Structure formats: structure tokens, C-alpha cells
């Protein structure tokens, strides 16, 4: 299984004549989703760690997309038609790609991940993105070892947090109104992202809210007296009934007034209205103010994800 890669045709790289091949795709379909989900279960059960693969989001975005291979985001290593290795690329705007992956416990230390990662780097070289973030659970020995072996530098750490069922929200939205964003708000959303995440405000990174809503990602603008003071993005997964809260922020001129808490409570209520059984979010460990806010609203830390960076 460690022989050099063979020829590339129709999005498939043959690793050996009989047993192994690598499938390359721009988007996953439902069969891919099932294969990746099955591999993820094997890895999580064995390692007792977490992964950030975003496959529910990817599947929902792929609906209606053409089958043309314009860029490669999905790298799948099969052995006897069983998926044993996977790396996925995510791009959420800016000049940075996010990469996460896994190898079946029974097929580790055989060069599977290295082969996939070489292909990922080849794809990265073709793109304008200057940086690549590699994600690993803080407790993943194999993940941390691989990242160290390629010389990536530590970037930051995030907690994944889930809302406890015991916590009761007793704060009313007295000031903040959450309005679902439409396409006219696209520039405003990109502008706010550039503030909160310290990324350049580029025209090509503009997200179209009504298109994202088709993929289960809904952005709400927070308004006070008809003025936009912040935003939040909610992800609704139909496959596992987990609702996600992302990109929550308050503009600098409106901070210190309790609006962040009101936006958070409003986001929780929106997800409950959509029948989310569990609600999660992610926060940088260095962001003590946000961390304390989330804890005070009933969120508890469930895992730690480390981010490492390599650059061109």
C-alpha cells in the first residue's frame, strides 16, 4: 500500500492494481457522506477524540452542484472498496484553508495520510490561499505527531462547547431584534467578519445569505432601534439534530451593553424553534470574555481543538 501513486484519471488515483485507490472530488455526495461518517465513527470510538470535518455542511452545499472537477476538496483513500483514509479542505473566506482528516485505526502508520496530504498540498499550491490550518484534537496522539512532523507552527486553540439541558434561559431580548439576513446584507456580513476574525475584506469572499440558507446556514443581523449592531450565523443539521452557533459578534461601538448575551440567547431560541436537540459552539481559548459569557449561559467545554499553520 506504500507504492508510488499511479496515473490520474476521472478523479481517481490508483495506488495498486487491485486493492487501493484514491478518489478526488470537489463535493461529496450522499454515498461519500455515509463512507466518511462510518470512518469517523471508527476513529472516534477508538481514539475518544473529536474531529471537525463539516461533512453535514458540505453535503448540503453540494446539492445541485455540477460534477465537474474544478477544484479538489475531498480526498478519499479506499482499500477493497472500504474508505480507510480521508482529508477534507474547507474554505470559509480569506486567504486560509482549513484541513482535517483521519485514518482507520487498523491502517495507520502505512503512509495513507501522507499520500493524501501530498495531494492536498498539490491542490493548495494551485490556489490563491496563502495559509493552511491543520486541525487536531488536543488529545489526538497521531494527529499531533503528524502535524509536528511537517513543521507546522501553533496558531490557536478552540473549545467546543455544548449547552447543558439543565440550564434555563431567563433573559429576555429587551433591546435586540434578530433579523434574517438577505442578499442585500452580504456586504455588511463580510465587513463584520473582517472585524471579528481579523481577515481582509475581499470582494471574492462575500457570502450570499440566501444561497447559504439552502445549505442550512442562516445568518441573522442583530438590530437595536433599526441599527445593525452585530450578527450571528446558525447551522441547522437535519442528520443529527445538532444546532451550531458561529460568527457571533458585536460591532465595537456597541460593546459593553449586554448585546452579546442577548444575541446568544436569541440564537439559542432560534435553534430550539428549529427542533435542535443539542446546541454547540466554538470559541478561542484566549477569548476569555466570550468564554465567560458562554459559560454563564449554560455552555460547557466538551473538547479542545488545536490549530496549526503552514504558509507558502
Question: How should each PLM-predicted stretch be described?
Answer:
Residues 4-17, 93, 105-174, 305-310:
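Acyl-donor-binding surface of acyltransferase catalytic domains
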Residues 19-38, 176-189:
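A short beta-loop-alpha structural element at the N-terminal edge
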Residues 44, 48, 52-120, 124, ...:
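Conserved donor-binding loop and adjoining core beta-sheet/short helix segment
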Residues 53-57, 172-243:
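Flexible, substrate/cofactor-facing loop regions flanked by secondary structure
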Residues 99, 132-135, 245, 279-283:
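Conserved hydrophobic beta-strand within the GNAT/NAT acetyltransferase core sheet
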Residues 100, 104, 108, 137, ...:
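Residue-level recognition of the GNAT/N-acetyltransferase active site
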Residues 109-122, 149, 247-250, 256-273, ...:
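Conserved acetyl-CoA-binding loop-helix of GNAT-fold acetyltransferases
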Amino acid at each position: 500500500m506504500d507504492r508510488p501513486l499511479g496515473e490520474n484519471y476521472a478523479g481517481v488515483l490508483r495506488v495498486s492494481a487491485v486493492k487501493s485507490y484514491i478518489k478526488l472530488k470537489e463535493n461529496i455526495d450522499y454515498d461519500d457522506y455515509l463512507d466518511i461518517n462510518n470512518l469517523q465513527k471508527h476513529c472516534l470510538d477508538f481514539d475518544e477524540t473529536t474531529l471537525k470535518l463539516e461533512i453535514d455542511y458540505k453535503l448540503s452545499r453540494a446539492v445541485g452542484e455540477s460534477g465537474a472537477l474544478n477544484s479538489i476538496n475531498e480526498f478519499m483513500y479506499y482499500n477493497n472498496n472500504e474508505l480507510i483514509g480521508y482529508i477534507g479542505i474547507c474554505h470559509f473566506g480569506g486567504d486560509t484553508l482549513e484541513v482535517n482528516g483521519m485514518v482507520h485505526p487498523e491502517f495507520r502508520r502505512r503512509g495513507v495520510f501522507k499520500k493524501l496530504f501530498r495531494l492536498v498540498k498539490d491542490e493548495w499550491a494551485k490556489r490563491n490561499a496563502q495559509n493552511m490550518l491543520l486541525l487536531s484534537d488536543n488529545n489526538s496522539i497521531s494527529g499531533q505527531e503528524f502535524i509536528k512532523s511537517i513543521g507546522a507552527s501553533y496558531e490557536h486553540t478552540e473549545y467546543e462547547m455544548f449547552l447543558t439541558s439543565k440550564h434555563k434561559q431567563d433573559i429576555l431580548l429587551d433591546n435586540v431584534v434578530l433579523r434574517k439576513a438577505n442578499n442585500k446584507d452580504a456586504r455588511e456580513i463580510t465587513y463584520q467578519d473582517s472585524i471579528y476574525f481579523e481577515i481582509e475584506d475581499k470582494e471574492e469572499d462575500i457570502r450570499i445569505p440566501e444561497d447559504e440558507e439552502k445549505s442550512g446556514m442562516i445568518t441573522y443581523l442583530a438590530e437595536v432601534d433599526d441599527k445593525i449592531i452585530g450578527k450571528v450565523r446558525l447551522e441547522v443539521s437535519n442528520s443529527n439534530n445538532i444546532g451550531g452557533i458561529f460568527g457571533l459578534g458585536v460591532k465595537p461601538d456597541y460593546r459593553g451593553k449586554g448585546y452579546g448575551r442577548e444575541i446568544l440567547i436569541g440564537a439559542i431560541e432560534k435553534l430550539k424553534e428549529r427542533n435542535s436537540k443539542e446546541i454547540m459552539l466554538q470559541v478561542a481559548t484566549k477569548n476569555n470574555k466570550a468564554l465567560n459569557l458562554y459559560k454563564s449561559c449554560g455552555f460547557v467545554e466538551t473538547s479542545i481543538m488545536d490549530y496549526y499553520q503552514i504558509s507558502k
